[in-house]
Amino acid sequence: MDIQKLLITGGTGLVGSAISTGTKLSSQDADLTIWEETYGILRQESPDSIIHCAARVGGVGSNINYKGEFFFENIMINTNVIEAARICGVKKLIAFLSTCVFPDDIEYPLTESKIHSGEPHSSNYPYAYAKRMVDIQIRAYREQYGLNYVSVIPTNVYGPNDNFNIDNGHVLPALIHKCYLAKNNNTDFSVWGSGKPLREFIYSEDVAKLTEWVLDEYDEDEPIIFTTSEEISIKDVVGLIVDAMGYEGKVNWQEDKPDGQYRKPSDNSKLKSYLPDFKFTPIDVGIKKSVEWFVENYEKARK
C-alpha cells in the first residue's frame, strides 16, 4: 500500500502521533463536525486509506457535564468522515471505538460480539452510543457498498502527546498532571474516587503498531479489541505515577467523587489468534515513559 496515500484524522493526538506514516490532519486543518469541511479536506488529500482517530474525548467529569456536546460532536465527526471517505473512493478505513460502547450490566469478559447487548454505563452513555453508531455505519456500508472499512476497540490508551488536562483528560494523563503539580507546589495529590475501580491500559505505541497491522491484514466485519487483558486498580496506577514522578507527599482520595464504572475486563483472544507473539509494553514502563515525556514537554503538552 502506498503510504503517501494514507490519511490520519486526529493525527496530532495520542494515537495519531504514534503512527509513523501518513498525512496527519488536526482540527486546524478542518472541522470534521461540518460536512463541507470534511468532504473538502478528503477531496483535497485524495487518500487511498484513512485511519480515523479524531474524536471528542474526556474523562468521567467531562462525560457527565457535557453529554450533549459529546454526543453531537462525535456523531457528526464519524458520520461525516465515513460518508466522505465513501464518496471520495477511500479503499480502506479504520475507525476507533472505545470499550465504553459495551453494556454496563453484562457477563465479563467483554468480547467483540457483545457491543449491542445492553445499555452502556450511565456516566458516559452519550459518547458510548455515538461510538456504537460507528460500528453500525461501517457494517451498513460494507453490506451496501462492499467497502473494506473496519473498526478497532482499544482499551484505555495512554502515552506521549496525550491530553493531560485535569478537567477533561482521561484518567491516567490527568493523574500524571495532578501529580506533577502536587510535586512542584508541595501540596497533596488529590484523586477522585476510592481508587478501587479496575482498568486495562494500553500504551499508544502498541496501539499504533496494531493499527498498522490492521491496515494491511484485518478485513473482518466484526471489530477487533486491542487489549493486554491485564487489569490494574486506579490505586495501583497512582502508585506507579507517584514512583515515576518521584512524588513524596500525601495522596488524598476524594471518595465523595464518582468512581465511574467499576470494571470492564475485555478478552484479547481474537487479537492473540492473529498475533500470538505480540509484546505489549508493561504498564510500569509505559507510565515511566509517559511521565518523563510530560515533564520534559510540559510547556507544549496539551493541558
Residues of each region from the PLM?
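Conserved catalytic-site region of short-chain dehydrogenase/reductase
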Residues: 60, 95-111, 126-132, 144, ...
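C-terminal substrate-binding subdomain of Rossmann-fold SDR/epimerase-dehydratase oxidoreductases
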Residues: 14, 20, 181-303
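Conserved Rossmann-fold NAD(P)-dependent oxidoreductase catalytic core, especially the SDR/UDP-sugar
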Residues: 79-124
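Short-chain dehydrogenase/reductase
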Residues: 71, 75, 119, 123-135, ...
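Active-site Tyr-X1-5-Lys
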Residues: 80, 122-155, 174-185
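NAD(P)H-binding glycine-rich loop region in Rossmannoid oxidoreductase-like domains
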Residues: 32, 36-74, 87
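N-terminal Rossmann NAD(P)H-binding glycine-rich loop of SDR-like oxidoreductase domains
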Residues: 3-21
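Flexible, glycine-rich beta-alpha linker
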Residues: 31, 101-103, 126, 150-174, ...
